From Swiss-Prot:
Subunit structure: Part of the 50S ribosomal subunit.
GO BP annotations, alphabetical order: cytoplasmic translation
Role this protein plays: This protein binds to the 23S rRNA, and is important in its secondary structure. It is located near the subunit interface in the base of the L7/L12 stalk, and near the tRNA binding site of the peptidyltransferase center.
PROSITE patterns: RIBOSOMAL_L6_1
GO molecular function annotation: rRNA binding; structural constituent of ribosome
Gene3D superfamilies: Ribosomal protein L6, alpha-beta domain
Protein name: Large ribosomal subunit protein uL6
Organism: Prochlorococcus marinus subsp. pastoris (strain CCMP1986 / NIES-2087 / MED4)
Record family assignment: Belongs to the universal ribosomal protein uL6 family.
Keywords: Ribonucleoprotein, Ribosomal protein, RNA-binding, rRNA-binding
Any GO CC annotation of this UniProt entry: cytosolic large ribosomal subunit
């Protein structure tokens, strides 16, 4: 049995969970999330917690046990607290700004790169070099942050590029010149 899947998901007072077959809807103060769960897992809602159990003893059912529990936990946390990823832009002349809802990144190309956020995602820019991506769905927040980082990933020689705020770039030594 999955060690993660064994523990029940606690549901705060402000959150309501609706389970219909494999479809789970979580509503909270920040919004609503709906997700279709994979087969092979049963969900039991008891008072203020959800217990996830494998439907059978087969391997595919046990594999999805911990996954489904974590997905539900992430949904509950998303509608109560939300998620955010912070990125840093390093390099001379590289900066970001918000135009309306869109994020415009100048990262050393001949043209600025404009990104339109999906529903439920907001971009915030502090001091032209710090970008915050926030929303209620952990997966979408992470994907959007990864798309922004992929515009100009950090390079190992000088560290220029777009990186996550807590990311450590492993630096390389440059070429040693002739003497």
């Amino acid at each position: 049995m999955s060690r993660i899947g064994k523990s029940p998901v606690q549901i705060p007072e402000k959150v309501s969970v609706d389970i219909k077959g494999l479809s789970i809807t979580v509503k909270g103060p920040k919004g609503e999330l709906k997700r279709l769960m994979p087969e092979g897992v049963n969900f039991d809602q008891k008072e203020n917690q959800i217990v996830v159990t494998p439907a059978t003893t087969k391997r595919y059912s046990r594999e999805r046990h911990g996954l489904c529990r974590t997905l539900i936990s992430n949904m509950v946390q998303g509608v109560t607290e939300g998620y955010e990823k912070k990125l840093e832009i390093v390099g001379v002349g590289s900066r970001a700004q918000v135009k309306g809802k869109n994020l415009v990144v100048s990262a050393g190309y001949s043209h600025p790169v404009e990104m339109t956020p999906p529903d439920g995602i907001t971009y915030k820019v502090e001091s032209n070099t710090n970008v915050t991506v926030s929303g209620i769905d952990k997966e979408i927040v992470g994907n959007e942050a990864a798309k922004i980082r992929s515009i100009r990933p950090p390079e190992p020689y000088k560290g220029k590029g777009i990186k996550y705020q807590d990311e450590r770039i492993i630096r390389k030594a440059g070429k040693s010149g002739k003497k």
